[in-house]
């Protein structure tokens, strides 16, 4: 007697299983993911394609392959997420590379530099290819940098990205040899400097930023200390503290302002710059220098202002000063601007916190 095995009870062959899996994958390819998962919980894992897990070291890219790569940032306006609004700045921040700078004494210094490059984005454009900013900048990176070289880099990426406004900012720590007050020792003082080139509405502005660190002795505390000594024979010392001024200046068209020039201008305005190399005679000299130049934060802002106003190479400017009090648990701060370039209704909430120089 012949016994027929029901089809449902027969174990499918490998070929039949492969055919069934191929059918399932064809169906899943054109079916919403939720429907695929709804068929059975383990179906998504079955239909997920197998991929190579080995890095293809010998794979090469030709022009046809590059042309096939998706480019979402240059996609149609229909891909824009959110409001179709103009973005004033979009780009990359803090890409670093060694840059060669020419100094006032005709030397060259290569310094690690942090670069920020941004462009404006029109309301109907999805995005930008940010790597073009780096590629444009790297094309000029071997040159000795100046505002003129920065302009050429900015022109390149503004053209490559088809943007109407653009900006480059370069931050670095600039070393200068500074002599001590009396001992004759010399040490390296490092100054945080940033160069900024802004192209907005077809108008270009060259801007330089300097953080100048100095000591501020409180004039009121100095007088109170002297009163205690004079009236009661009581030894007292005035409070003083490390202080920082962030000086931002617009360099007038056609003018040359060296880093060293701006540093010396700041030092002449407020001579109590913190010291590098110090022996006992230098420490005593610094105490005398502070006593001869007591200064409130208002005085500091106005002293820098007076020096900046007197330099014909400088247009608009801003002084942000912070006296990081040793008497109080708070700081004394001031902001002074001249001209429209730095005028602002609002201040960055972290502006004054960014002025701390911890050494």
From Swiss-Prot:
It comes from the Bacteria. Pathway: Cofactor biosynthesis; 7,8-dihydroneopterin triphosphate biosynthesis; 7,8-dihydroneopterin triphosphate from GTP: step 1/1. One of its GO terms (biological process) is tetrahydrofolate biosynthetic process. One of its GO terms (molecular function) is GTP cyclohydrolase I activity. The record marks 218 as: May be catalytically important. Its EC number is 3.5.4.16. The keyword Hydrolase applies. It catalyses: GTP + H2O = 7,8-dihydroneopterin 3'-triphosphate + formate + H(+). Keywords: Hydrolase. Pfam families: GCHY-1 (PF02649). The keyword Metal-binding does not apply. Belongs to the GTP cyclohydrolase IV family. This is GTP cyclohydrolase FolE2. It comes from Cereibacter sphaeroides (strain ATCC 17025 / ATH 2.4.3) (Rhodobacter sphaeroides). The gene is folE2.
């Amino acid at each position: 007697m012949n016994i027929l095995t029901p089809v449902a009870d027969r174990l499918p062959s490998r070929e039949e299983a492969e055919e069934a899996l191929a059918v399932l994958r064809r169906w899943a390819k054109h079916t919403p993911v939720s429907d695929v998962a709804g068929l059975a919980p383990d179906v998504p894992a079955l239909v997920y394609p197998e991929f190579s897990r080995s890095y293809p070291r010998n794979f090469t890219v030709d022009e046809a392959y590059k042309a096939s790569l998706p480019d979402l940032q240059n996609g149609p306006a229909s891909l824009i997420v959110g409001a179709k609004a103009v973005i004033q700045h979009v780009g990359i921040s803090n890409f670093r590379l060694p840059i060669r700078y020419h100094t006032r004494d005709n030397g060259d210094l290569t310094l690690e530099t942090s670069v920020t490059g941004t462009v404006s984005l029109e309301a109907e454009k999805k995005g930008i290819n940010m790597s073009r900013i780096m590629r444009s900048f790297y094309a000029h990176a071997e040159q000795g940098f100046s505002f003129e070289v920065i302009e050429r880099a900015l022109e390149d990426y503004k053209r490559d990205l088809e943007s109407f406004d653009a900006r480059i900012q370069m931050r670095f720590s600039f070393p200068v040899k500074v002599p001590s007050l009396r001992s004759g020792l010399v040490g390296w003082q490092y100054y945080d400097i940033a160069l900024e080139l802004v192209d907005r509405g077809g108008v270009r502005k060259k801007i330089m930023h300097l953080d100048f660190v100095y000591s501020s002795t409180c004039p009121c505390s100095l007088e109170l200390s002297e009163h205690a000594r004079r009236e009661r024979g009581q030894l007292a010392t005035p409070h003083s503290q490390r202080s920082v001024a962030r000086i931002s200046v617009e360099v007038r068209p056609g003018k040359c302002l060296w880093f060293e020039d701006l540093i010396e201008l700041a030092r002449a305005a407020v001579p109590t710059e913190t010291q590098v190399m110090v022996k006992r005679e230098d420490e005593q000299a610094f105490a005398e220098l502070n006593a001869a130049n007591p200064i409130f934060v208002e005085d500091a802002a106005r002293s820098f202002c007076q020096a900046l106003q007197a330099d014909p190479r400088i247009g608009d400017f801003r002084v942000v000063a912070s006296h990081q009090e040793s008497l109080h648990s708070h700081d004394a701060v001031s902001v002074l601007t001249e001209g429209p370039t730095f005028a602002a209704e609002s201040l960055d909430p972290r502006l004054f916190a960014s002025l701390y120089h911890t050494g």
